Swiss-Prot record:
Keyword RNA-binding: yes
Subunit annotation: Part of the 50S ribosomal subunit. Forms a cluster with proteins L14 and L19.
Residue(s) carrying N5-methylglutamine: 153
Organismal lineage: Bacteria, Pseudomonadati, Pseudomonadota, Gammaproteobacteria, Alteromonadales
One Pfam family named in its UniProt record: Ribosomal_L3
Family the UniProt entry places it in: Belongs to the universal ribosomal protein uL3 family.
Top-rank lineage group of the source organism: Bacteria
Protein name: Large ribosomal subunit protein uL3
Gene Ontology cellular component terms for the protein in this record: cytosolic large ribosomal subunit
Keywords: Methylation, Ribonucleoprotein, Ribosomal protein, RNA-binding, rRNA-binding
Function: One of the primary rRNA binding proteins, it binds directly near the 3'-end of the 23S rRNA, where it nucleates assembly of the 50S subunit.
Modified how: Methylated by PrmB.
Organism: Shewanella halifaxensis (strain HAW-EB4)
GO terms under biological process: translation
InterPro entries membership: Ribosomal_uL3, Ribosomal_uL3_bac/org-type, Ribosomal_uL3_CS, Transl_B-barrel_sf
Length: 212
């Protein structure tokens, strides 16, 4: 798995390409990712990089967190994330090193992972794109009802996984193969074509596309 970075969704805008076409882009701010721990096969049984980014008020840091950051010799960040490493990947990266947006300079497409916007409790029409029932012709109470949820005496139960009303959104979502439009190393910005999961200011994990 290729090394990724943690970023923050700034918002969406558009830019014009060389042909004058309008391209919708999402602006992702990727401040320096500081390496807090290097997982190895010998000590942990797998290879990975643990990173942090951003800042956190001193009075919001727990004692275990403070000790962990102090041991790594890096400034406390707003969270900790791990990136699994393939064999031979990430060699030479040590604790305290900084990873910046310029690692995407030669990358054409990326996968972006974030937490989707929460929608609360929603019905089947919004949650699963069910069709509405008749507006008239005898229907007076079930316009947005889900309809039948099963059979009769056989099997006599509702199958697991049946699409019904319930909580929608606020789950981990990955959007794959987003084209990298621009890498602005001076301002720590990455511009990708299209939308990415989550709300403005939400944390994102950006990795080179696995299906590119």
């Amino acid at each position: 798995m290729a090394i990724g970075l943690i970023g923050r969704k700034v918002g969406m805008t558009r830019i014009f390409n060389e042909d004058g076409a309008s391209v919708p882009v999402t602006v992702i701010e990727i401040a320096a990712n500081r390496v807090t721990q290097v997982r190895t096969l010998d000590t942990d049984g797998y290879r990975a990089l643990q990173v942090t980014t951003g800042t956190k008020k001193a009075n919001r840091i727990t004692k275990p967190e403070a000790g962990h950051f102090a041991k790594a010799g890096v400034e406390a960040g707003r969270g900790l994330w791990e990136m699994r490493l393939a064999d031979g990947e990430g060699e030479g990266i040590e604790v305290g090193a900084e990873l910046n947006v310029d690692i995407f300079a030669d990358i054409a497409k990326v996968d972006v992972t974030g937490q989707s916007k929460g929608k609360g409790f929603q019905g089947g029409i919004k949650r699963w794109n069910f069709a509405m029932q008749d507006a008239t012709h005898g229907n007076s109470l079930a316009h947005r009802s889900n309809g039948s949820i099963g059979q009769n005496q056989t099997p006599g139960r509702v199958f697991k996984g049946k699409k019904m009303s319930g909580h929608m959104g606020a789950e981990r979502v990955t959007t794959q193969n987003l084209e990298v439009i621009r890498v602005d190393a001076e301002r720590n910005l990455l511009l990708v074509k299209g939308a990415v999961p989550g709300a403005t200011n939400g944390d994102l994990i950006i990795k080179p596309a696995v299906k590119a």
